[in-house]
Amino acid sequence: MNSTKIKEIEFQNVIVDPKINNLHLKTNTDISSNYYKAGTHIGHKSIHLSETHSWHPSMAQYHLGIRDNITICNVQQTQKCLSRAFYVLTQILDNGGNVLIVNTNPEFYKLSINSMKFIEKNLPFQTFSAISYCFYKWIGGTLTNYKQISKSIYCYVKFTQRCGKFCEKNNIDFTRYQKIKKCFQGYGSVSGDSIVMSLQKKPDVIFIFNPGDNKNLILEANRLQIPVIGCTDMSSNTNGISYPIPCNNTSVEFTLYLYKKLYKVLHYISTKKK
């Protein structure tokens, strides 16, 4: 699917059933039985197969074979690892934990932002506040130097609280503000007259959609002993990733499916607590 069409994808006709099993959360666009159709199994093509591997040795257990010089991922392993990862995610959220979602792939920026807006709009604030996210650029030291970074996040949220609506209404554009907004908008928000910092110093788990581009984040998480869930393609190194999900992490359909699955988990938890 062309990246220009990503912005057209929205959450539509999502079936909500609070009694569903949290390991098999289904929607009307569930692709759990259609991974091949979604391109989840497609790995990377090696330029010189005789000289370089098109798959990383740490992904050998998820490797099904090679066809037309392209590695093929075992989708049964994908489904197994996905169930395990979302079970861990559900248990952490159900016990009041915090989750950090990271997807810095620029092609998925619009899709990721729209997904979070949908989740925020359709869930209680208390439930959504357990989620923090980064979809633009991971700033090194955000976790290990949280004391300093949190001051910048607070200043951004405070400015948004005072001037955000005014700037938007009068079409006033600050280049620096827009750049900071892309980096920090998922770390804090305004609830009434109070400021809520959704990013805690130490999240209980980090969900990374493109771990290959966020190696520094994985190092920070390992240093702080934070478990990491990662969508790993066949060329990814799984070292430092606690719960790898072997897949094609550039698949639009699979990425959208993960966001829908996350929404179903959060809705299940919010319904359970009522």
UniProtKB/Swiss-Prot annotation:
Keywords assigned by UniProt, alphabetized: Mitochondrion, Ribonucleoprotein, Ribosomal protein
Entry's Gene Ontology cellular component terms: mitochondrial small ribosomal subunit
UniProt-listed GO biological process terms: translation
InterPro entries assigned: Ribosomal_uS2 (IPR001865), Ribosomal_uS2_bac/mit/plastid (IPR005706), Ribosomal_uS2_CS (IPR018130), Ribosomal_uS2_flav_dom_sf (IPR023591)
Chief site of localization: mitochondrion
HAMAP family: Ribosomal_uS2_B
Protein name: Small ribosomal subunit protein uS2m
Species name: Prototheca wickerhamii
